[in-house]
Amino acid sequence: GIPCGESCVWIPCLTSAIGCSCKSKVCYRD
């Protein structure tokens, strides 16, 4: 539920390396 400061409209979350995932076109962590 914490925004990672990255969008995932066109590309996947690069922040997935630190546990972020794409939700509603924005990368979130928990």
UniProtKB/Swiss-Prot annotation:
There is a cross-link at G1-D30 (Cyclopeptide (Gly-Asp)). Keywords: Disulfide bond, Knottin, Plant defense. It holds the Pfam family Cyclotide. PROSITE patterns: CYCLOTIDE (PS51052), CYCLOTIDE_BRACELET (PS60008). Signal peptide: none annotated. It comes from the Eukaryota. Disulfide bonds join C4-C20, C8-C22, C13-C27. This is a cyclic peptide. The keyword Disulfide bond applies. One of its GO terms (biological process) is defense response. The keyword Transferase does not apply. InterPro entries: Cyclotide, Cyclotide_bracelet_CS, Cyclotide_sf. Probably participates in a plant defense mechanism. The presence of a 'disulfide through disulfide knot' structurally defines this protein as a knottin. Belongs to the cyclotide family. Bracelet subfamily. This is Cycloviolacin-O20. The lineage of its organism: Eukaryota, Viridiplantae, Streptophyta, Embryophyta, Tracheophyta.
